[in-house]
C-alpha cells in the first residue's frame, strides 16, 4: 500500500507534460483533452497511482522481447507513457465477502476493500509508423507470461498479414529466448510429446497461435468479422 498515492504525478506522464509545457512537443486538441483527463485523475482522491507495475513491464520487454528482425527491444518513451496509463491506475471498492470460520463449519460476511485496475480498455489514435503493432505485442506477451491465471487473448486486423505483424516479433523473441524467463520457458523440445511434460517446451508457437503450456494460456489471430470475433 505504501507505493500507492492519490496525489502523485505519474513518472512518464510528468516528463511528457513538462516537455509539452516547455514547447518541445506540440500537441493537438485530442491529446490536450487526454492530458486534462489525466490531470483530473491526479487531483481526484478516489484514484490511486502505483509506479511499480509499469517498471516491471518495461523490464520484461527490454530483457525478453525482440523486434521482428531479432534485435533487442528498447521501449520508446511513448510506449512507457501508454503502458503507465494501462498498468498504474487503481481504485477501491467495498464488497461483502463470505468468510468461513477457522473450523470449516459456517461463516459470516465481512466487508473488504478490493483494489481494482481503472483502465480496462485503451484506444490509440495515432498515425502510421508509431509502432502500434509492436506495443500490442508487448502487452500480449506480458499478459500471457506474467499473469499466472489462464488467459485467452485475441489479436485481429483487417487482413491476416496485418495481424501477423503483432505475432511475428513475439515468435522471434521465443526463438531467440534472450532473457531468463524465455530461456526457461523454451527449455526442452516441442517434439517431445511422449515423455514427462517438464521436458517439453512450455512457450510455443503452434497452429492455434502462441501457447503458454504452464498456464494453458493462448494468444490467437482471428479475422476481423463479427461472426468470427463473437
Residue ranges and their predicted role:
Residues 1-230:
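Phosphate/NTP-binding elements of NTP-utilizing enzymes
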Amino acid at each position: 500500500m505504501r507505493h500507492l498515492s492519490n496525489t502523485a504525478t505519474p513518472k512518464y506522464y510528468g516528463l511528457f507534460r513538462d516537455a509539452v509545457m516547455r514547447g518541445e512537443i506540440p500537441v493537438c486538441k485530442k491529446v490536450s483533452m487526454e492530458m486534462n483527463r489525466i490531470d483530473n485523475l491526479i487531483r481526484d482522491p478516489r484514484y490511486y497511482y502505483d509506479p511499480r507495475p509499469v517498471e516491471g513491464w518495461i523490464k520484461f520487454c527490454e530483457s525478453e522481447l525482440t523486434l521482428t528482425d531479432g534485435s533487442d527491444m528498447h521501449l520508446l518513451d511513448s510506449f512507457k507513457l501508454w503502458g503507465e496509463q494501462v498498468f498504474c491506475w487503481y481504485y477501491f471498492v467495498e464488497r461483502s465477502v463470505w468468510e468461513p470460520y477457522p473450523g470449516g463449519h459456517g461463516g459470516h460476511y465481512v466487508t473488504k476493500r478490493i483494489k481494482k485496475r481503472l483502465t480496462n480498455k485503451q484506444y490509440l489514435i495515432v498515425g502510421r509508423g508509431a509502432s502500434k503493432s509492436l506495443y500490442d505485442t508487448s502487452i500480449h506477451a506480458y499478459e500471457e507470461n506474467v499473469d499466472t491465471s489462464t488467459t485467452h487473448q485475441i489479436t485481429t486486423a483487417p487482413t491476416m498479414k496485418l495481424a501477423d505483424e503483432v505475432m511475428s516479433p513475439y515468435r522471434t523473441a521465443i526463438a531467440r529466448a534472450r532473457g531468463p524467463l524465455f530461456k526457461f520457458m523454451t527449455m526442452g523440445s516441442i517434439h517431445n510429446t511422449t515423455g514427462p511434460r517438464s521436458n517439453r517446451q512450455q512457450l510455443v508457437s503452434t497452429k492455434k497461435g502462441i501457447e503458454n503450456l504452464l498456464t494453458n494460456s493462448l494468444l490467437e489471430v482471428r479475422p476481423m468479422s463479427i461472426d468470427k470475433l463473437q
